């Protein structure tokens, strides 16, 4: 009975890891035709955020430059000018399609994220017993590791999250979050988060090491500081 209970959290953990990805993929595939049809037929207003508006304006500026070029080369043969106008028309249609596709992807990503969050919340509420067993299993696994491996793992994790090269990773993650939810990418806000969030994490880590690890395993703290130096 104990062995069976110990194995129960493993399928639970696998479902937590793979279920959101599977739902995201199936949800996008099944809902994309419906969202595309709804956006193209029922959408009466065009609402852009600052980034999308900037991209659209840049695209139309390029088209305007092509029109000016068209005016400058009117002495060219009519067939050449006609081909140029057809090309500009195709580029305009492509620009509108890209704009619509961006909105469709934002709607799909936002809906998928909300669905995955709801499923994970239901898992955490309904699977309380599995979470307790999983927590005890993780604690037992960490307890059996040597202090050197623990210190090395903590050092590796902290370097990845708050190390010298971490701001680039934080910029990518925050930018991806903004893009998935369709928010306006404010460079000042992103820069502020990148400069302050790692500092907050570093402070929390030092507090945890001082108040928890120093009490539970002083040798681990000594090894950690030795590796860090």
UniProtKB/Swiss-Prot annotation:
**Gene Ontology BP, a term:** potassium ion transport
Q: Which Gene Ontology CC terms are recorded?
A: chloroplast inner membrane
TM stretches of this protein: 7-27, 106-126, 189-209
Q: Name one GO molecular function term.
A: antiporter activity
Q: Where in the cell is it found?
A: Plastid, Chloroplast inner membrane
- Gene (name only): cemA
Task: Report what the protein is called.
Answer: Potassium/proton antiporter CemA
Q: Which PANTHER family match?
A: CHLOROPLAST ENVELOPE MEMBRANE PROTEIN, CHLOROPLAST ENVELOPE MEMBRANE PROTEIN-RELATED
State the similarity comment: Belongs to the CemA family.
**Keyword list, A-Z:** Antiport, Chloroplast, Hydrogen ion transport, Ion transport, Membrane, Plastid, Plastid inner membrane, Potassium, Potassium transport, Transmembrane, Transmembrane helix, Transport
Query: How would you describe this protein's topology in the membrane?
Result: Multi-pass membrane protein
Name the species this protein comes from. Nymphaea alba (White water-lily)
Among HAMAP family, the record links this protein to: CemA_PxcA (MF_01308)
Its function? Contributes to K(+)/H(+) antiport activity by supporting proton efflux to control proton extrusion and homeostasis in chloroplasts in a light-dependent manner to modulate photosynthesis. Prevents excessive induction of non-photochemical quenching (NPQ) under continuous-light conditions. Indirectly promotes efficient inorganic carbon uptake into chloroplasts.
Its recorded reaction(s) are: K(+)(in) + H(+)(out) = K(+)(out) + H(+)(in)
């Amino acid at each position: 009975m104990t062995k069976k209970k110990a194995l129960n959290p493993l399928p639970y953990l696998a479902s937590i890891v793979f279920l959101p990805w599977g739902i995201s993929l199936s949800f996008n595939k099944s809902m994309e035709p419906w969202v595309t049809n709804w956006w193209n037929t029922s959408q009466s207003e065009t609402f852009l955020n600052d980034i999308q508006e900037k991209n659209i304006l840049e695209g139309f500026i390029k088209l305007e430059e092509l029109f000016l070029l068209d005016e400058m080369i009117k002495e060219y043969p009519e067939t050449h000018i006609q081909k140029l106008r057809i090309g500009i028309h195709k580029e305009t249609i492509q620009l509108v399609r890209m704009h619509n596709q961006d909105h469709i992807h934002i709607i799909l990503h936002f809906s998928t994220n909300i669905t995955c969050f709801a499923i994970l919340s239901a898992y955490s509420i309904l699977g309380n017993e599995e979470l307790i067993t999983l927590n005890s299993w993780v604690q037992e696994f960490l307890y059996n590791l040597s202090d050197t491996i623990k210190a090395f793992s903590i050092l590796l994790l902290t370097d990845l999250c708050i190390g010298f090269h971490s701001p680039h990773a934080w910029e990518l993650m925050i930018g991806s979050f903004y893009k998935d939810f369709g928010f306006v990418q404010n460079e000042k806000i992103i820069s502020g988060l990148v400069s302050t969030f790692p500092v907050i994490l570093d402070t929390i880590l030092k507090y945890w090491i001082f108040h928890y690890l120093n009490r539970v395993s002083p040798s681990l703290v000594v090894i950690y500081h030795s590796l860090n130096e």
